[in-house]
Amino acid sequence: MAKKWLNKVKWDDNGLVPVIVQEAGSNDVLMFAFMNRDALLRTVELGEAVFWSRSRKRLWHKGEESGHVQKVHEIRLDCDEDVVLLKVTQVDSIACHTGRHSCFFQKFDGDADTGDWQTVEPVLKDPAQIYTKP
């Protein structure tokens, strides 16, 4: 059966679309990733976020190693049809591989000459504990 809805997405030259992941309820931006057609289809089928890992060159089911899956509540396409927004519930409140709630834990503070990036979110769990394989 043809999945015509996938054709509405404007995939880039590599067959990818940028994805913003936002926490349902708080509206916190948790992370940014990419999807290909298969990842978006699997996300819809599973009800959990599946991305395309550009470094591993394979589908990446978020939480497959850590258990920190993202339950998808809503999928939106932006006005240009070239960015996807996932509204999710983040299992165990950890979205970032650094053990933080959000991947956006560094905030610029200061001016153009003396400013710097400050860490503004705590580590909720040591990544060594998250990714230790039994």
Curated annotation (Swiss-Prot):
It is found in: Cytoplasm. One of its GO terms (cellular component) is cytoplasm. GO terms for biological process: L-histidine biosynthetic process. Mg(2+) binds at D78, D80, D82. Keywords: Amino-acid biosynthesis, Cytoplasm, Histidine biosynthesis, Hydrolase, Magnesium, Metal-binding, Zinc. It is an enzyme of class 3 (hydrolase). Binds 1 Mg(2+) ion per subunit. GO terms for molecular function: magnesium ion binding; phosphoribosyl-AMP cyclohydrolase activity; zinc ion binding. Its cofactor is Mg(2+); Zn(2+). Pathway: Amino-acid biosynthesis; L-histidine biosynthesis; L-histidine from 5-phospho-alpha-D-ribose 1-diphosphate: step 3/9. Its EC number is 3.5.4.19. It catalyses: 1-(5-phospho-beta-D-ribosyl)-5'-AMP + H2O = 1-(5-phospho-beta-D-ribosyl)-5-[(5-phospho-beta-D-ribosylamino)methylideneamino]imidazole-4-carboxamide. Homodimer. Catalyzes the hydrolysis of the adenine ring of phosphoribosyl-AMP. This is Phosphoribosyl-AMP cyclohydrolase. It comes from Cupriavidus taiwanensis (strain DSM 17343 / BCRC 17206 / CCUG 44338 / CIP 107171 / LMG 19424 / R1). The gene is hisI.
